[in-house]
Amino acid sequence: MNVAFDLTPPSPSQREALIATLNAEEHRILLQHGTEAPFCNRLLDNNQLGTYTCRFCGLPLFHSNAKFKSGTGWPSFFEPYTHAHIRKQHDTSHGMIRTEILCARCNSHLGHLFPDGPPPTYERYCLNSVSLTFIPTGTLLPDQLHRGDNTAYRT
């Protein structure tokens, strides 16, 4: 279900409160554009039905029906929950030219987008598990910013 969510960034005080909830690895990946090691992340082999939300702000990012096994060692999806929830940015770090993907609401680093996915989009959204929280189908979506916009929707 694609519904409208408030994409206003967290206020400075909300952002500081959210930063305080991160462990060192989450901070490195979400806020410093890091990457977790392949094949040893918690959501790679998750096959449950549900929604993957931003670990930092709770915005729905991907649905399990768009997840596929890419063989790369990171959770991969062929399309986002809605394109409005993903921001794309040109990335030339580490001597490569790539498209970085970030949460459209809080600007947290999620991973990268590659043009080698399956039909129908032929895109591969390659994500860090650390950047995501999995919400099983039938569970209320998180409302980390206390705006009341997520709590009416179940995955």
Curated annotation (Swiss-Prot):
Q: Name one GO molecular function term.
A: zinc ion binding
Q: What Enzyme Commission number(s) apply to this enzyme? A: 1.8.4.12
Q: Name one GO biological process term.
A: protein repair
Catalytic reactions of this protein: L-methionyl-[protein] + [thioredoxin]-disulfide + H2O = L-methionyl-(R)-S-oxide-[protein] + [thioredoxin]-dithiol
Q: How is the cofactor bound?
A: Binds 1 zinc ion per subunit. The zinc ion is important for the structural integrity of the protein.
Which organism does this record belong to? Answer: Xylella fastidiosa (strain 9a5c)
UniProt name for this protein: Peptide methionine sulfoxide reductase MsrB
- The organism's place on the tree of life at top rank: Bacteria
Q: Binding of Zn(2+): at which residues?
A: C54, C57, C103, C106
Fetch the NCBIfam families from UniProt.
Answer: peptide-methionine (R)-S-oxide reductase MsrB
